[in-house]
């Protein structure tokens, strides 16, 4: 890890870089992201959370579980993008499975955008169900810690809403991976 290699702590780095960042920014965002980036060389891996789908859970079970949890948690399913199916139809060639599920809590989304227009790039929340090149299935989503802790502290009202969305998306992702609802 970067901390072990260079003998630095996240507190020292945080104070050197910017005292205006969230006090947990180094611990929750920048050190884990940097370590993953250095380990993999892949910035996209450093910015996501992935969960392995249980082998005994079908794709339709994943989808049903995620939809059920989203409904129970009061977040809207706002679309699905069956990418692998679309490419198969266009090319006639079999593709490994990739489908993107989109979720949104509209009032929370507008509150976030009212704080910063840049939050719109995070909308809607997405979870991708993908079969990797070895046949293993995963659920991927953006790591919301960057949005929550990566800059200056969010106002309390917004932090509460952002943490709730993170909690719900995590529940959807974990429940989908296990086929639980």
PLM regions: where:
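N-terminal hydrophobic signal/anchor transmembrane helix of membrane proteins
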Residues: 61-79, 163-178
């Amino acid at each position: 890890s970067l901390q072990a290699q260079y003998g630095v702590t996240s507190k020292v780095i945080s104070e050197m870089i910017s005292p205006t960042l969230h006090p947990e920014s180094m611990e929750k965002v920048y050190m884990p992201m940097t370590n993953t980036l250095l380990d993999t060389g892949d910035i996209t891996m450093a910015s996501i959370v992935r969960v392995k789908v249980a082998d005994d859970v079908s794709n339709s079970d994943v989808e049903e579980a995620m939809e059920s949890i989203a409904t129970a948690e009061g977040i809207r399913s706002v679309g699905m993008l069956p990418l692998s199916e679309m490419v198969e139809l266009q090319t006639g060639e079999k593709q490994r499975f990739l489908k993107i599920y989109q979720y949104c809590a509209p009032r929370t989304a507008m509150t976030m955008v009212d704080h910063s227009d840049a939050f719109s790039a995070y909308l809607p929340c997405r979870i991708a169900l993908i079969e990797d090149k070895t046949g293993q299935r995963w659920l991927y989503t953006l790591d919301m810690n960057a949005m929550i802790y990566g800059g200056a502290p969010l106002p309390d009202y917004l932090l509460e809403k952002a943490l709730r969305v993170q909690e719900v998306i995590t529940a959807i992702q974990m429940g989908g991976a296990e086929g639980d609802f």
